[in-house]
């Protein structure tokens, strides 16, 4: 996977971390997410909180290979991992008691990728 065209060092590091975890654990999930982040930025997912609230259940682990935006409200207690969060999304997630973090943090906690849902 070629990440030499990425300008952001943080993004390059995130992709490399996910690829390494995928190799070590044998999980194709983290490899797929790393490939999605290595693609063009126009192809990144942009997911609103209302969509997460609509499709997720309490206790779910949701991964968004892109951006989480703060449109809508969230009433379920979920863990959300994404490349970036908007300010309003972070505020609404923390106010509702949800956990949010980088994708690599979720991958380190759950290297096999069990019970993780990708949302686009």
Curated annotation (Swiss-Prot):
A single Gene Ontology CC term: cytosolic large ribosomal subunit
Keyword terms of this UniProt record: Ribonucleoprotein, Ribosomal protein
Superkingdom of origin organism: Archaea
Entries under Gene3D superfamilies matching the protein: 3.100.10.10
GO function term, MF aspect, one: RNA binding
GO BP term, pick one: translation
Family stated for the protein in its record: Belongs to the eukaryotic ribosomal protein eL18 family.
Cited NCBIfam families: PRK04005.1
HAMAP family hit by this protein: Ribosomal_eL18
Protein name per the record: Large ribosomal subunit protein eL18
Originating species: Thermoplasma acidophilum (strain ATCC 25905 / DSM 1728 / JCM 9062 / NBRC 15155 / AMRC-C165)
Name of the encoding gene: rpl18e
């Amino acid at each position: 996977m070629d990440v030499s065209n990425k300008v952001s060092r943080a993004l390059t590091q995130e992709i490399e971390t996910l690829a390494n975890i995928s190799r070590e654990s044998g999980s194709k999930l983290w490899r797929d997410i790393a490939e999605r982040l290595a693609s063009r930025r126009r192809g990144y997912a942009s997911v609103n909180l209302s969509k997460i609230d609509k499709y997720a259940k309490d206790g779910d682990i949701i991964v968004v290979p892109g951006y989480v935006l703060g449109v809508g409200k969230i009433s379920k207690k979920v863990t959300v991992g994404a490349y970036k969060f908007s300010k309003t999304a972070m505020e609404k997630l923390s106010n509702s008691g949800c956990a949010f973090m980088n994708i690599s943090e979720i991958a380190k906690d759950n290297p096999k990728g069990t019970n993780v849902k990708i949302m686009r």
